[in-house]
Amino acid sequence: MPATVASMNVAFRQPSMTRDQFLDWAEAQERRYEFDGFQPVAMTGGSSNHSTTCQNIWSALRTRLRGSGCKVLGPDAGVATVGDAVRYPDALVTCAKYPGTAKLIPGVVAVFEVLSPTSGRADRIDKLREYRAVPSIRRYVVLEHRSAGLVVFWRPDGTADWTATALTAEEALDMPELGIVVPVQEFYEDVDFSGA
């Protein structure tokens, strides 16, 4: 539980650990955690559809990025966001060079999150706010979990305002900053929405 400091009838959360302390602590845990800048937050497990969608994202991006100097990484790759927060998105793309032992990935250009029944608010509001604050991130893609479709938040350069665009299964995700286009349906190959 984080320490609380009361001042003028307002409670302020004090960090229970620093980002570096969290990164060291998280390595020794059996469960996966993110860090909200104040305390560790347990990450929930996903469904078969969630796993399949993530694999499809990695495959689609890796195939298209091969030889470009950019690469896609999965949910073990951390992103430093606002304050001391650390997020582990379902997929990210970076074109930066960094050591293989890096705990936080620099130069992240695109971030992908697959929604789950419990992550909607965090993915659409909290993480969007955090990812928008990272200058290198140009695209944040939130994929639906009940049907094939996504919302992409993007900015044409590191300083412009963000724009949101919803895409259906029949459309394609254009990522000019990476020089690639991916049909939305490709992210949902072998995903069974019956019962979703």
Where are these regions (language model features)?
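Gly/Pro/Ser/Thr-rich low-complexity, intrinsically disordered segments predominantly at protein N-termini
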Residues: 1-196
